């Protein structure tokens, strides 16, 4: 489903109630909210209707800006081969920094080789800086790597860049700095454990609310992109489950253009929608205006079967008028007054303009719904009375979820500090060694091999 509307027209309230209905029905739901208000309003509505209470273990509330609990999200400790994991993270980087990385020719090779090495050891993104600048530590890790291409890249190319190395690896290190210097990202992405198991959330019908409202723009884009690429991979991994038994999961992504199929993305939006739907992940994409989208996204928007258009700006109204509007070549503007006169037919340009005005001047809580059969229906939504829920009740629901799935903030800091103070390959190795096989997979090897 696709939803568009400028601020104040009712788009967020529609998403809120769609989410609530899915949660109440016991469906798996995921919300990525870049502003934070929608996630909080969903909790208020659920508390008012007594759907999600503090004892409900379905709820996972993820707010990386909190200073009491951290939910570990180790994107390198996820299902898939090291190569698949690396490609997913590189794709998220490209969606976060599309312009700068398109101009960095060495980024893809450096990042892929580094991420494959770290993923095989079940390390974290914040270890990437040390891997790239500490040759002794890098060599200790490469001793455990069986993939000749990865080893060859570092020993035969990377280590031979000499004085040019700082310049050639700078594009990668600049992006690594985004999460090594940022306290929120460092603690979330720097834990060895991963407690945001997106595949499990889908399969078990859990509710993940991601509140990015207090994050800065770069943090918001990076975490959102990592989550969306993770959702794409988790959905694709469900091919091992018969289609008839795949539990549907519904993901709502507000301001989706920042996280999916933007100019830096390898995948097109059409590909993402098709692949996710095939494996039981149903996406609802929302944003404010078409100028936020690249041209290649526009065609995909036209192919989405269900579109809901709230009040939009003039330019957008003109585009959607042609998409959902209908004109009548036989429509009469003025009837003939005498037998010798002919009726005056309504010019098509005027009819298209009428549709444009309708879309532009839609009052709040009114929208046009474009159905799969091409018809468009105008809808009205009712006003909802304010929720009689206190901020303290919402906070208690969040804290109950964080206590269940999170790690105390100070404990997360201590864990990373302890790892940084350790040295040697065994200090950062996992309980069992994992080596990259020649085909990019992971195989177990005896400790110390």
List each model region and its residues.
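Active-site glycine-centered loops adjacent to acidic/histidine catalytic or metal-binding residues
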Residues: 288
């Amino acid at each position: 489903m696709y939803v568009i509307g400028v601020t104040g027209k009712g788009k967020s309230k529609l998403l809120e109630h769609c989410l609530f209905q899915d949660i109440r029905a016991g469906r798996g739901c995921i919300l990525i909210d870049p502003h934070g208000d929608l996630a909080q309003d969903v909790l208020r509505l659920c508390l008012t209707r007594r759907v999600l209470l503090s004892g409900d273990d379905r709820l996972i509330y993820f707010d990386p800006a909190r200073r009491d609990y951290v939910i570990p999200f180790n994107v390198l400790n996820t299902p898939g081969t090291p190569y698949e994991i690396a490609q997913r993270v590189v794709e998220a980087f490209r969606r976060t920094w599309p312009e700068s990385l398109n101009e960095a020719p060495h980024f893809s090779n450096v990042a892929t080789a580094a991420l494959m090495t770290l993923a095989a050891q079940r390390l974290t993104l914040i270890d990437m800086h040390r891997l790239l600048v500490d040759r002794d530590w890098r060599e200790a890790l490469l001793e455990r790597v069986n993939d000749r291409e990865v080893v060859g890249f570092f020993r035969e190319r990377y280590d031979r860049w000499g004085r040019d190395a700082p310049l050639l690896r700078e594009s990668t290190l600049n992006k690594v700095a985004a999460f090594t210097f940022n306290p929120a990202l460092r603690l979330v992405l720097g834990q060895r454990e991963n407690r945001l198991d997106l595949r499990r959330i889908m399969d078990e019908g859990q509710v993940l609310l991601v509140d990015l409202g207090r994050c800065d723009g770069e943090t918001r884009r990076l975490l959102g992109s990592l989550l969306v690429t993770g959702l794409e991979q988790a959905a694709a991994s469900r091919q091992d489950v018969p289609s008839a038994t795949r539990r549907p999961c519904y993901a709502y992504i507000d301001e989706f253009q920042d996280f999916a199929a933007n100019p830096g993305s390898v995948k097109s939006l059409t590909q993402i929608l098709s692949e996710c739907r095939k494996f039981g992940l149903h996406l609802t994409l929302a944003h404010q205006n078409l100028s936020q989208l690249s041209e290649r996204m526009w065609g995909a928007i036209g192919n989405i079967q269900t579109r809901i258009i709230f009040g939009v700006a003039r330019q957008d109204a003109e585009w959607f008028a042609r998409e959902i509007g209908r004109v009548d070549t036989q429509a009469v503007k003025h009837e003939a007054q005498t037998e010798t006169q002919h009726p005056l037919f309504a010019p098509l340009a005027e009819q298209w303009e009428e549709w444009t005005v309708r879309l532009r001047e839609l009052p709040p809580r009114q929208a046009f719904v474009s159905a799969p059969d091409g018809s468009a229906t105008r809808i009205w939504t009712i006003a909802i009375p304010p929720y009689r829920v206190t901020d303290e009740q919402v906070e208690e629901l969040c804290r109950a979820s964080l206590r269940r799935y999170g790690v105390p903030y100070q404990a997360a800091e201590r864990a990373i500090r302890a790892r940084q103070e350790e040295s040697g390959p065994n200090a950062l190795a996992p309980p069992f060694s994992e080596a990259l096989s020649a085909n990019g997979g992971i195989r177990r090897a005896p400790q110390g091999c």
